[in-house]
Amino acid sequence: MKAKYIFLAAFAAAVALTQTSCEKVSPQGVLMAGTAVEDRVDMSYQYYQQNNFEYKLDDDINLSMADEGYSFIVGADSHVTTDLGRMREMFQIGLDNDDLLYCHLGDIADTKPEYYIHLQNCIGEATYNYIEKYYEYHEDDEKLHRKGVPNSVGRDYDDIRFPFFPVVGNHDLTHNGWGMWSNIFGSSFYTIDVPVGYDENGYRVYDHFIFLDTASGTLGRLQVDLIERGVLDGQGHYRNTFVFSHTNIFLPQSFQFASTFPREEAYFLLKQFDKWNATIVFCGHVHKWDERLYNMVYFLTLDSMSERNSPDPGDYLVRVNIDKDGAIDIEKVHMSYVAPKK
């Protein structure tokens, strides 16, 4: 974490901070990126292969929580600048509820280097609070151990990752933002498995989380190829599959496809969701709530949690509660933070 902070601080010093931010962020923006989707996916896939340990949950967490049921929380389009109120609130809400994962649907920050420094500091604060709540120091081995878990593995502070998993959005990439985003989060294209028990034959069963790079409004040839090769399929026995995409598939409150994806890719994704036996597909981007059931897949498009786009308190987060048998309950989660008046 320290090295990444130094990189961002140096980057901030080297870049003239001359861009102006709008009082309200456009949901559409410009679907473009300083680094094209083919390059992003190529970099992400290589990073994911070499560092896939970063996309695994702590075994102690799984053993102590997921087998008996768990929850995860989802937010979208936070557009962080200098005000971290809503992002801090999301993290605190998750900690207070013992949510297992924190997922984000992209456009996490506007692309000034200083905003990414603020964001990384916010994640650092959340990591500290997370460790304070769930870990305790053992003097015998001078390590941090999971509270309430007998024989838990001892860890150093820097080895404990706060379980925050975002996708990349189009606003994360403007003004050459990919370098800043990827420096913090690594890959924009990855999966996570949550162990949730055993089947009748004694095989481990998982819930499967798939994170796509749709920030440019297209998957690109390489990402389609990797998906067709089964890179995101996983190798386990899966109970539920959850898919996360910044760009929405459907227009809110409409039976039409969104205009961002090429039509062939939209159909490709719908077929892929069926192949993955997807339970829920989460989308952001348009700053407008939408929910629908299509081909037995539940699609949720979330409103923006940004205090600029959604200045009043409101239900901007979603929590998914999963019991030990895999049954799912979805609830909207209220956010109370209001930005101080200038």
Give, region by region, the residue ranges found by the protein language model:
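C-terminal motif of bacterial Sec signal peptides marking the signal peptidase cleavage site
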Residues: L17-S21
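Extended active-site neighborhood of metal-dependent phosphoesterases/phosphodiesterases
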Residues: D42-L57, N62-L63, E114-N240, E265-K275, ...
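Outer-membrane beta-barrel translocator/channel fold
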Residues: Y116, L251-E265
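Short acidic, glycine-rich surface-loop motifs adjacent to enzyme active sites
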Residues: G234-Q253
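Active-site glycine-centered loops adjacent to acidic/histidine catalytic or metal-binding residues
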Residues: D77, G106-D107, G169-N170, H246, ...
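Bacterial N-terminal signal peptides that target proteins for export
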Residues: M1-F7
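Histidine-centered catalytic micro-motifs
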Residues: V243-I249, T279-W289
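N-terminal active-site segment of His-dependent metallophosphoesterases
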Residues: E23-Q120
